[in-house]
Amino acid sequence: MPLIYVLDTSAVTDPRLREIFGVKTLDGVVREYARLLIRSHIVLGAEFYTTPSTALELRSFLERNNVSREAIDMLMGAITIRSPDLYTTRIPAIIMSDWIHDMLIRITKGLRVAEDSVRRAARRGYDYGVAQDKKGFEESVAETIHELREKYREATRKGVIDTRVDFDLVVLAHEINGELVTNDTGIMKLCMQIGVKYIEPPRFINKLFLLLRERTGRV
């Protein structure tokens, strides 16, 4: 059975990988990751893919987090970039029906989060107004906005496909019968619904280590 994998951004950026690779920095993870993919391709014939949008997202993330250009180029050179076939790939209509229903529930939850934040902000604003504490009021506004963003994101985005980038990955994995490497619960959920294999990053790395050890006697 061919080893075909589709990599999400989290396949590389998962913080648990530092311990597995025995390094302290993301740059170290990327270098070890690239070496592992190259060796797995040569020894095991494994193939590694990602989509153009994920490749761009991954490169941008790594650059923002001080990963060297050399390490990034090593990694990207080990991964084949391929666009999914969005025109002929078929996905059951029930998936879209469930997604719409889920989003309606999430929108309602998001509205409740916003309403609660407005009420809290009004109470805090009144208290600081009575006390004539302008600085305290401004800090309270900033805190309320931060809380709103976190709770709104939790209510509306966690555990659901909410970007074209994520959707493209699942379609590509479905199209080429690959195993999707991700720690994103929304992506995992869609994979389960349409029968796409998936694996979390730590298990993926350990799986490659094990296969290499069985084939060569060493990693």
Swiss-Prot record:
One of its GO terms (biological process) is tRNA 5'-leader removal. Its EC number is 3.1.26.5. InterPro entries: RNA_free_RNase_P (IPR014856). It comes from the Archaea. GO terms for molecular function: ribonuclease P activity. Keywords: Endonuclease, Hydrolase, Nuclease, tRNA processing. It catalyses: Endonucleolytic cleavage of RNA, removing 5'-extranucleotides from tRNA precursor. The keyword Cytoplasm does not apply. RNA-free RNase P that catalyzes the removal of the 5'-leader sequence from pre-tRNA to produce the mature 5'-terminus. Belongs to the HARP family. This is RNA-free ribonuclease P.
